[in-house]
A protein has these predicted regions:
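Positively charged, polar, low-complexity stretches
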Residues: 1-85
Length: 85
């Protein structure tokens, strides 16, 4: 299981750094690249997103775009499961 703790996010750079820690082969710094990474996962992967409210506070409207992208990636890749806690 991979854990993304949104309490550590103060800006977009933090967001993409944390995703890079969760997914070592991730090299992009935008939502399109992250979407490509998540939809190309070839083994079962669980991502737990903690403290989502902190992301909303730090990222503002960008957090909405992030959540839409995460939900889309989960719908497109049956091997990806995302939990928000």
């Amino acid at each position: 299981m991979k854990i993304l703790d949104c309490a550590q996010i103060q800006n977009r750079d933090d967001l993409f750094r944390l995703f890079g820690e969760c997914f070592p082969h991730y090299i992009g710094h935008n939502l399109d690249a992250l979407h490509d990474q998540l939809t190309s996962l070839s083994s079962p992967t669980e991502l737990t997103v903690q403290n989502w409210a902190a992301a909303e506070e730090s990222l503002g409207r960008y957090a909405n775009a992030l959540k839409r992208m995460l939900n889309d990636a989960e719908a497109e890749n049956p091997l990806l499961t995302i939990h928000y806690i």
